[in-house]
Design a protein with these regions (language model features):
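Conserved glycosyltransferase catalytic-site signature
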Residues: 114, 136, 177, 210-211
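Short catalytic/ligand-binding loop motif for oxyanion handling, primarily in non-cytosolic enzymes
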Residues: 14, 44-47, 62-63, 139-142, ...
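Short acidic-hydrophobic catalytic motif
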Residues: 102
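GT-A fold catalytic core of metal-dependent nucleotide-sugar glycosyltransferases
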Residues: 105, 109-161
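Catalytic core and acceptor-binding pocket of nucleotide-sugar-dependent glycosyltransferases
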Residues: 179-211
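Short beta-strand-to-loop element that shapes/binds the nucleotide-sugar donor at the catalytic cleft/hinge
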Residues: 149-150, 154-176, 181
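Short His-Asn-centered micro-motif
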Residues: 6-10, 37-40, 112, 133-135, ...
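N-terminal anchoring/stem segment of glycosyltransferases
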Residues: 1-99, 122-127, 184
């Protein structure tokens, strides 16, 4: 199995946490795993040679068109405040968060991860899986390839860390998306990636319940 691990970090946080997490992957992941770092700022000078850096500003210009268009719209940034001509949350929303500031509607912030994954999947010849891991994840011991193989089965399109709690009966409303695998051998993965990107390029993401 050939795995392409991808991650990114918020500009200005390389020294505070991202370097530690990403370099722990270098130290603990097997050689069959390649590590790609998507950067929005100048490439860090102290990045390990095993890491391939991708300039996100050049690789995915559509991301920054989206962010520039909606950066001054508080609703698109998770706020309850609205502006004239701005986007609106769905009138069909239910639940306690619908009238509060919430990450559930911070489309501008979370668009970065979407376009990193889109770019990685579309530039993945020779790989079996693209695996997103948040940059603040610290790998504290060696991870054998067999462990990845168990987590990334061949028959599923996506793999993620669920938070299903039978006592809550909520169906696992908020999954942990700091670890998500995309099976490149599955026939629907690239269709999914295309549809995911299309939510952002024309702004259709604002038509769904949560962004």
């Amino acid at each position: 199995m050939k795995i392409k691990v991808i991650t990114s970090y918020k500009p200005g946080t390389w020294g505070s946490f991202a370097k530690r997490g990403i370099h722990s992957m270098v130290e603990q992941f097997p050689p069959e795993v390649d590590i790609f770092l998507y950067c929005e700022e100048q490439q860090p000078k102290d990045v390990d040679d095993r890491i391939t850096c991708v300039d996100l500003t050049q690789a995915e210009t559509e991301l920054f068109k989206f962010k520039d268009k909606y950066k001054d719209d508080p609703t698109a940034n998770g706020k309850i405040k609205q502006i004239e001509g701005g986007v609106r949350r769905s009138p069909n929303l239910q639940g306690l968060d619908k009238d509060k500031d919430s990450f559930l509607w911070d489309a501008v912030r979370f668009a970065n991860k979407v376009f990193c994954v889109v770019n990685a999947v579309r530039n993945s010849d020779g790989y079996d899986y693209v695996l997103w891991i948040d940059a603040d994840t610290f790998t504290f011991r060696s991870v054998p390839l067999e462990f990845f193989s168990k987590l990334l089965p061949e028959e599923t399109m996506l793999t993620y860390l669920g938070r299903e709690n039978p006592t809550l009966g909520d169906g696992g409303v908020y999954p942990e998306c700091g670890f998500v695998g995309y099976n490149l051998k599955h026939p629907e993965t690239r269709n999914f990636i295309h549809d995911w990107e299309r939510l952002y390029t024309p702004g259709d993401v604002f038509k769904i319940l949560e962004w």
